[in-house]
Amino acid sequence: MNLHEYQSKHLLKKYNIPVPASEVVFNPDAAVDAAAKIGGDRWVVKAQVHAGGRGKAGGVRLVKNKEELKSAVKALLGMRLVTYQTDERGQPVNQILVEQTSDIARELYLGAVIDRASQRIVFMASTEGGVEIEKVAEKSPEKILKVTVDPAIGLQPFQCRQLFFGLGLQDLKQMRSFTDIVMGLYRLFTERDLSLLEINPLVITGSGELICLDAKINIDDSALYRQSELREMRDTTQEDEHETMAQQWELNYIKLDGNIGCMVNGAGLAMATMDLIKLSGGDPANFLDVGGSATKERVTEAFKIIVSDKNVKGILVNIFGGIVRCDLIADGIISAVKEVGIDVPVVVRLEGNNAQLGAKKLADSGMNIIAAKGFADAAEQIVKQVGVIA
């Protein structure tokens, strides 16, 4: 789950991490009130969307008076902001962050992520603040400093100092402030079950202070059951509606750009299915894992989600029956196809417990359901069917 910038900064303040004074607003008049509360005669207006690249897309604006402020907020609210991280439809702007300006002398990058290889939290820092860290990693990986956290003892102050001096910084007052910030970020990361945390940029002001000018936070979805405060911060308007619907039924769904819908039980089998579709000359329209218990209800909802994508011209169902019998899965598929009213070809490959009986039920159903003879045959059949339609 992703948080908006204003929500992320709200969390940072709870951990005594310095951020600029700011207010989130939902209309132009509230923006004027927010500016009066913040003070000053210039402000930064930031569109709140779950995507990077806002500045280049016109979603971050510097305003020099309250008339410009109202005009900027009015222009941004309600629009769909298109950045390099969104699709062509963009993300809806429903909130605006009005923030005090900062006297920026230097921009740094600071982030933390769970490294799957080492199974540990890794903190990263770079002198290349204010730009996409992915570009830095690609072009100048030597400019990214890393420290790995031992989970038995946690992040240590000496590791913060390693990053500080590695950035070419020397001031002892700044070192203490930097250490406090990084240690606070570590507590935030572990206590709130984060999977990604980025401060980009972390700025050094003209007076030598360190301030977190922007913040990005991703939360581990699997831990939301114990993070009730964060769970309430979810903004479903920023998420794909298909993925939101899938989460309600505990289905793992990711939309792709192809035209062959996939329904599979098991993430590994789902990825192998997508690979085989691609190898056979097709393009998968989604990743969809119905999980180990492919009940009739979940299969029905999975079909509804798949066919709600207008690009889908055919569906491949690939189920391995272990504990769940394939004949019962076949009953669920037939019932779901009838209920949803699917008018595109459906190819089903069943393997495992009672697979032959399940295939017979599909063949005898009288519906537009093709029982495949094997894994490769299933991929070839659906690609062929979609090719005929195209």
Swiss-Prot record:
Describe the protein's quaternary organization and the partners it interacts with: Heterotetramer of two alpha and two beta subunits.
Q: Please give the NCBIfam families that the UniProt record associates with this protein.
A: PRK00696.1, sucCoAbeta
Q: Which InterPro entries match?
A: ATP-grasp, ATP-grasp_succ-CoA_synth-type, ATP_grasp_subdomain_1, Succ-CoA_synthase_bsu_CS, SUCC_ACL_C, Succ_CoA_ligase-like_bsu, Succinyl-CoA_synth-like
Q: Which residues form the ATP-grasp domain?
A: 9-245
GO biological process terms held by the UniProt record: succinyl-CoA metabolic process; tricarboxylic acid cycle
- Top-level lineage group: Bacteria
Any idea of its EC number?
Answer: 6.2.1.5
Annotated gene: sucC
Role description: Succinyl-CoA synthetase functions in the citric acid cycle (TCA), coupling the hydrolysis of succinyl-CoA to the synthesis of either ATP or GTP and thus represents the only step of substrate-level phosphorylation in the TCA. The beta subunit provides nucleotide specificity of the enzyme and binds the substrate succinate, while the binding sites for coenzyme A and phosphate are found in the alpha subunit.
The catalysed reaction is: succinate + ATP + CoA = succinyl-CoA + ADP + phosphate; GTP + succinate + CoA = succinyl-CoA + GDP + phosphate
Report the sequence similarity comment from the record.
Belongs to the succinate/malate CoA ligase beta subunit family.
List the keywords (alphabetical).
ATP-binding, Ligase, Magnesium, Metal-binding, Nucleotide-binding, Tricarboxylic acid cycle
What molecular function terms (GO) are annotated for this protein?
ATP binding; magnesium ion binding; succinate-CoA ligase (ADP-forming) activity; succinate-CoA ligase (GDP-forming) activity
Can you tell me which residues bind Mg(2+)?
A: N200, D214
Positions bound to substrate = N265, G322, I323, V324
Which cofactors? Mg(2+)
Q: Which enzyme type, at the first EC level?
A: ligase
Cofactor note as given: Binds 1 Mg(2+) ion per subunit.
GO annotation, cellular component aspect: cytosol; succinate-CoA ligase complex
Pathway this chain belongs to: Carbohydrate metabolism; tricarboxylic acid cycle; succinate from succinyl-CoA (ligase route): step 1/1
Kindly provide the name given to this protein in its UniProt entry: Succinate--CoA ligase [ADP-forming] subunit beta
Quote the record's binding site residues for ATP. K46, G53, R54, G55, E99, S102, E107
Query: Record's Pfam families?
Result: ATP-grasp_2 (PF08442), Ligase_CoA (PF00549)
